[in-house]
Amino acid sequence: GGQNLIEDGVYNCLAGEPWEQGINGAIWALLSVDTKGYPIPEGAKYSREDLIQYILENQVKSGGWTLSGNIADADITGMAIQALAPYYTGDEAVKAAVDQGLTFLRNGISADGDLESGGDYNCESTAQAIVAFAAMGIDPSSVTSSGGRSLMDGLAKYYNTSTGGFLHKSTNRTSNALATGQAMYAIAAYRYYQQGLSLYDFRDTANTAQYVARADGAVYTAAAGADAALFVGEGA
């Protein structure tokens, strides 16, 4: 028994369309099939192109994405960029959409280096932006506010020294499980970026493959490995 999460959950989705719950579904479906480059057979109900197109069609005027309505949200924008990142150099429509999304995130960075969702600056929005920039081969520590505080500085704002966890909002007193989980994988994404790797690349060859970094339209390559360092040019 059991179900194949890639076949039954994505390209031959048994529970309606992959985006049944909204754009979140399409984003994570695309991330899932790309973790190991899973092939989608001819005749499948849904293709990679279907997932990409759904994400592109749901970008809002401000350049970001949202779970509902027409006001862009940093969390969903970050996730959408993460899903589209592998297609940036080969698809002009994807490139244009991602560039707009990155601009939206950059413009939303506060003086402290964090981002907000629903009017509240918080850990999770900041974490998703970090993962998005890392996925694009852009050093999150180089993405700064006008005052010079980086996204990594913004994330550190939510660290709870008394518990080792992360707060949802800086005014909270108790660490939050969701905030801590997202902060930890944002830190992992940053570490992978430093090694020339990608958070969502689960291929067996990921540690030895050549990594292509996409930074504001420029393409850089570096031998990826445990000790590899990746330096992205100016404009990243």
Task: Label every model-predicted segment.
Residues 154, 165-228:
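Terminal, non-catalytic domain-edge segments
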Residues 232-236:
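Gram-positive cell-envelope targeting signals
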Residues 145-159:
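Extended hydrophobic/aromatic segments used for targeting, binding, or gating
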Residues 103-109, 113:
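Flexible internal linker/loop segments at domain or repeat junctions
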Residues 6-7, 48-52, 98, 102, ...:
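Core helices of alpha-solenoid repeat scaffolds
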Residues 1-4, 15-48, 60-97, 111-144, ...:
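An alpha-helical repeat/solenoid feature that recognizes helix-turn-helix modules
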